[in-house]
């Protein structure tokens, strides 16, 4: 129900074929090396399997597939990277709701349980969604020191860290999403 994106009909084989063709076009003609797929949890897994298999079949090309989602089935479908929403939620609870910091180790272990080899989880303290709908890391994590501590934790716990626009310089204002 987003107003800025089309809701595609994944029941349509013609739409699926065109979407995969478009993805292949970008890989071949624009020489991109991967895709970040928004709201990947909401797209049927069999579509992702077909699309990623097609992209991985391009000769002499290694694609990076990044799913904005946290279903581990996305990794089985061929994505190498998913969002660590569980960890991020617990991290905010540690800073704002007095959750024991040891819970971060528990959620981290759970996140990595059963993951296929050569797959990773993205760790962050801010991204475009959080900045648009929630607040800045400085506000969420109780100041600049808290935001830096939270970021260190995202590095320490493993995964792939995300540095969002302005975070590296302590940006304290929300960036316009649109």
Please report, for each region that a protein language model flagged, where it lies by residue:
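Aromatic- and acidic-residue-enriched carbohydrate-binding clefts of CAZyme catalytic domains
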Residues: 1-11, 24
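Alpha-helical scaffold elements lining the catalytic groove of polysaccharide deacetylases
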Residues: 11-18
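Short loop/turn motifs at secondary-structure junctions
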Residues: 30-31, 159
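Active-site-proximal helices and loops of the catalytic beta/alpha 8
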Residues: 22-24, 28, 38-124, 138-144, ...
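Conserved short secondary-structure transition element at the edge of the structured enzyme core
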Residues: 152-170
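Amphipathic coiled-coil/heptad-repeat helices and related helical stalk/stem segments
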Residues: 19, 146-147
């Amino acid at each position: 129900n987003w107003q800025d994106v089309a809701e595609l009909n994944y029941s349509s084989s013609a739409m699926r074929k065109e979407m995969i063709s478009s993805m292949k076009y970008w890989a071949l003609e624009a020489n991109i090396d991967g895709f970040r797929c928004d709201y990947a949890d909401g797209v049927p897994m069999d579509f992702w399997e077909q699309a990623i298999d097609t992209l991985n079949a391009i000769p002499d090309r290694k694609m990076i597939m990044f799913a904005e989602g946290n279903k581990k089935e996305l990794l089985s479908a061929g994505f190498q990277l998913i969002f660590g929403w569980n960890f991020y939620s617990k991290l905010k609870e540690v800073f704002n709701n007095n959750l024991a910091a040891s819970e971060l180790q528990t959620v981290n272990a759970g996140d990595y349980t059963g993951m296929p080899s050569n797959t990773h989880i993205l760790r962050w303290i801010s991204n475009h969604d959080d900045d648009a709908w929630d607040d800045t890391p400085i506000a969420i994590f109780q100041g600049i020191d808290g935001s830096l501590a939270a970021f260190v934790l995202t590095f320490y716990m493993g995964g792939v860290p995300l540095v969002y626009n302005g975070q590296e310089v302590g940006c304290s204002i929300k960036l316009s999403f649109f």
